[in-house]
């Protein structure tokens, strides 16, 4: 039994040893295979590296050759350019040398000519001195002989000759002057008649008479009561804001607005039309619509003025003056619309200036602006001439325009053809049959004078003459005029109107002082 165990153990040991040795041999064989594979890969890598290096060397050589070829090519081009430039400079140098030689030769010839001329001048000068000496000797001999024969001294003979020549010259000059004066007068009259005929036949103006009332149509009679408002609050607000007289009478479905100021009357008409259309007639709404309409009117005036300036082709004009041009539409003089009159004068003056050889565009510009001050006479005191000249000076209008403004009423003499043309055109436009009405203008001037007296007082914001000039409403600044001063102001204005304006009946002076306190609840 023990023998079997020993034999079995020995066999197991031998078997294990044989397996170990076999595994070692297998591992050794694998290691050898790996080493051979590694050597083969290393050799392949080395071969690839050598191949890459060879390719790189070839590329470097090709690049060197390319750079060398480019360098040689550029060098050749530079050399060729240099040679061309050098040849050009050489040619210029040769040309300049030749020019210098030619100029030097020319200067030498000129010097010779100058020398010869100087010698000739000296010779002639000597001859002149000799002749002068001989002439003086001869003159003295003749003079002495004449004095002996005439019994006069030299000075007496000179005076006698000069006196005779002066008398004859004066007579001849007087005849010539008289002749040309008569011809000039005839030609001037003929030319003036021709120019006026040309101007009047090439322009035909329209007559636009001024009215003092506007009628606003209303859908029903109950609107009249709403316009008046509770205790007359609405109509008082309207009249105070608009500066017109609102007449509500038995005329069916109509409200009459009366004012000599066309601008106020137009705004009032639009405001009442919008109020009637809106239906909300109350003081706050009245003020809101009034501000809106006034803003729209100002924009319309600017656009209308711009259109007129463009149509006349007179260049750029300051926007403030353009707005005043549009406002002339709502101003009249002796019943003649101021804007229509200014346009008429502009066209006539342009035609006349062109006929007389002046600047047609400048004459049109001066003609359009000659009465621009009339757009301001309702708001500021002073003549329309002074106001117009001041506004044009402020906005840098040309001197020709300012001179025309002063000259058309004789404040200055016209200093240019254009200013003279404006004066003549203004007279033509005003004198045209049917152009003006004197009675209406006298009334308008009286009403305007009443407003100007009120506006001239300190603290006065606005002044409106209403009721055909029988009442003036004066709105004062509550911060500058207190209640007691308002009473004194009314008396002072009334006294100035009595002394400064001629009027029938009596005029009511109504000074209004209103103080508002406004706050918002948020």
UniProtKB/Swiss-Prot annotation:
Compartments reported by the entry: Cell membrane
GO cellular component: plasma membrane
Membrane topology qualifier: Single-pass membrane protein
GO BP of this protein: mRNA catabolic process
Enzyme class label: hydrolase
Residues that span the membrane, as ranges: 2-22
E.C. numbers: 3.1.-.-
Annotated HD domain residues: 338-431
UniProt keyword annotations, A-Z: Cell membrane, Endonuclease, Hydrolase, Membrane, Nuclease, RNA-binding, Transmembrane, Transmembrane helix
One term of GO molecular function: RNA binding
Primary role: Endoribonuclease that initiates mRNA decay.
The protein's name in its UniProt record: Ribonuclease Y
Organism listed in the record: Nitratiruptor sp. (strain SB155-2)
